[in-house]
């Protein structure tokens, strides 16, 4: 975290998290960004970036068909608008959160700040590991014709234990040199001019606020690096050694494939032009016209010129089996069902019931992640509601939030067959089936059904019998 020391000194506070946690998070973020510490040009060890795959898949499943609905009043409509503006950021935010273990969503008066652990320092927490004091660092740069100005803001959130007030303190600085805090300046001279230097807040009825004015996402697994830490662990922190083994196995397999080219070693006497004296043979002599896989060698004698074909045998099947074992073990330790990640695709039809049975561990893991995401969104919406009161952004009113997620075991063909049975049995209207599975509007589906029914009622050639 840039200016960590200066930010803590500004408010005379100390971090409650250890340096070890900073190291763990940095190590994991390097793996996520395809820069794991085990990369080696000397030993030809590369990475397939599977740490990102784990985060990406977790975020994809957890945000599948996510819907956040806020109802109840004009205030609720305003809150809904704020969430809808960021709808397509949910998956991205969650992927980064899985990589870093923690993220914070905080209203800033004009929008929403997304913050990873390198942008904040936790300075207080309760016995349950909930954040009760935190310092945020924010920066931006202004470029002029001859120079640049670097602006920094330290923002301190905490509760006053004596009065129950929620306190926010903002301190701003400007420097003409990158990497320096610079001199203090009034907040009105920065882009944060809409904020106040010091704010104290309680509810309109004078009661203390119920929670901090931001949402916190923390991965669901317990932190075994720092017990009762307010920070979560990256989802793959427990499999770094296995990720290293996976990269080594992949690199060895790729190296073997690269070196598997067919080679023919042929005596240079066999490649000499007709009529050229044998006495002109020389060691290291280049012979033009040979294919790229043929190499001339010097050493044959008389009527026994040297010739040998080398066709390296690949151990691909064995190596793929080993890679799949690593993948399965990695997935299981992260929270996925055994065999969820494999190189070879699954074949055959799988019903939703089978998927639910086979992937029960995956389903539970994703549910846990969704629960944590819901709690984070609840915190964000609560903070937006308080800011709306503070700055008069929307009319006062009640709101209620509901969350809906897609079923990760959903099978469209199975659902189609079930709905068609409903239609045949008279339990559902046919137009609903066509709307749901054929992409028709309600009007189009009803018109098609009416047309078909009309054709069936037309009289035959000899009239109605």
At which residue positions do the language-model features occur?
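Extended, helix-rich architectural segments
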Residues: 1-145, 464-465
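Extended, non-catalytic structural segments that build the interaction scaffolds
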Residues: 22-45, 298-333, 350-375, 400-433
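Short amphipathic alpha-helical segments
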Residues: 75, 82, 86-90, 238, ...
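Short coil/turn segments at secondary-structure boundaries
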Residues: 94, 107-110, 257-266, 340-346, ...
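Extended, regular secondary-structure scaffolds
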Residues: 104-233
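Extended, charged amphipathic alpha-helical segments
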Residues: 195-357, 400, 406-408
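Active/binding-pocket-proximal capping segment
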Residues: 330, 344-351, 380-387, 393-402, ...
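Activation/maturation switch segments at domain boundaries
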Residues: 417-465
